[in-house]
């Protein structure tokens, strides 16, 4: 404990400095990483979800209303 508050050799920062700074950076980076991961998951899952929903709706509309397209035209 005799080095408490003394600069780390080669780092030029006090011993007590990196802990809060790295802690805040880690929390900030983790939140951004989770946000990015959720965004990538949403971007990856959303098209499949929309494709599945559109396919079910299209198949259902064709099955129950086969003349809907012809009537629209």
From Swiss-Prot:
Induction: Up-regulated by endoplasmic reticulum stress and proteasomal inhibition. The keyword Mitochondrion applies. The keyword 4Fe-4S does not apply. Its main location: mitochondrion. It is found in: Mitochondrion outer membrane. Detected in brain homogenate, primary neurons, and peripheral blood mononuclear cells (at protein level). One of its GO terms (cellular component) is mitochondrial outer membrane. The chain crosses the membrane at residues 32-52. It is a single-pass membrane protein. It comes from the Eukaryota. Keywords: Membrane, Mitochondrion, Mitochondrion outer membrane, Transmembrane, Transmembrane helix. Coiled coil: none annotated. This protein is produced by a bicistronic gene which also produces the major prion protein/PRNP from an overlapping reading frame. This is Alternative prion protein. It comes from Homo sapiens.
